[in-house]
Amino acid sequence: MASKLETLKANLEAAFGGLLLNLSEAIGELTIVVKASDYLNVATRLRDDRSLGFEQCVDLCGVDYQTYAEGAYDGPRFAAVLHLLSVQNNWRLRLRVFAPDDEVPILPSVVEIWNSVNWYEREAFDLYGIVFEGHPDLRRILTDYGFIGHPFRKDFPVSGYVEMRYDPEEKRVVYQPVTIEPREITPRVIREDRYGGLKH
């Protein structure tokens, strides 16, 4: 008798065949990768096909692969990764889709398929700059309205570009260039022979 994972893998291969750029298994979960042009069709079928039945999207996040594999990675930079759940079949799936353009990453929105992704797509837009075409309300959700840039991108400086503070003279919050000075952080070394006051 086939395991749940083997059954799901067979069902995915039967449903999508050549549309899957990659189908891999790690830590007891399957991951499929599809092209951006096939994304909506694959997502719709994942939800509607009774042999798959992924009626819930429990998470969607953006990923920046700029420094992946210590710079050895040479593929597209931005991706959206969805974690899907089938309650009726009791299985999970990870769906990954890469944005074809690294300069202006654009992917179709799947809000019409799984309405739970509404705020997830807004978060990926806010933090990574991934534009989800067809999203009903694509605007920033975590950063300030005047924020410039996307803070989870690998090329965004850790200290940011501006800081805000309350100015008592102007009686309002003001923006100013970052005043944090660069510094070298030296890790504290804990010697095993003196750890916690114990002698070995």
From Swiss-Prot:
<dbReference type="GO" id="GO:0008137">
    <property type="term" value="F:NADH dehydrogenase (ubiquinone) activity"/>
</dbReference>
<keyword id="KW-0520">NAD</keyword>
<keyword id="KW-0997">Cell inner membrane</keyword>
<keyword id="KW-0472">Membrane</keyword>
<keyword id="KW-0813">Transport</keyword>
<keyword id="KW-1278">Translocase</keyword>
<dbReference type="InterPro" id="IPR001268">
    <property type="entry name" value="NADH_UbQ_OxRdtase_30kDa_su"/>
</dbReference>
<comment type="subunit">
    <text>NDH-1 is composed of 14 different subunits. Subunits NuoB, C, D, E, F, and G constitute the peripheral sector of the complex.</text>
</comment>
<dbReference type="GO" id="GO:0050136">
    <property type="term" value="F:NADH:ubiquinone reductase (non-electrogenic) activity"/>
</dbReference>
<dbReference type="InterPro" id="IPR010218">
    <property type="entry name" value="NADH_DH_suC"/>
</dbReference>
<comment type="similarity">
    <text>Belongs to the complex I 30 kDa subunit family.</text>
</comment>
<dbReference type="GO" id="GO:0048038">
    <property type="term" value="F:quinone binding"/>
</dbReference>
<protein>
    <recommendedName>
        <fullName>NADH-quinone oxidoreductase subunit C</fullName>
        <ecNumber>7.1.1.-</ecNumber>
    </recommendedName>
</protein>
<dbReference type="GO" id="GO:0005886">
    <property type="term" value="C:plasma membrane"/>
</dbReference>
<keyword id="KW-0830">Ubiquinone</keyword>
<dbReference type="InterPro" id="IPR037232">
    <property type="entry name" value="NADH_quin_OxRdtase_su_C/D-like"/>
</dbReference>
<dbReference type="InterPro" id="IPR020396">
    <property type="entry name" value="NADH_UbQ_OxRdtase_CS"/>
</dbReference>
<dbReference type="Pfam" id="PF00329">
    <property type="entry name" value="Complex1_30kDa"/>
</dbReference>
<keyword id="KW-1003">Cell membrane</keyword>
<keyword id="KW-0874">Quinone</keyword>
<comment type="function">
    <text>NDH-1 shuttles electrons from NADH, via FMN and iron-sulfur (Fe-S) centers, to quinones in the respiratory chain. The immediate electron acceptor for the enzyme in this species is believed to be ubiquinone. Couples the redox reaction to proton translocation (for every two electrons transferred, four hydrogen ions are translocated across the cytoplasmic membrane), and thus conserves the redox energy in a proton gradient.</text>
</comment>
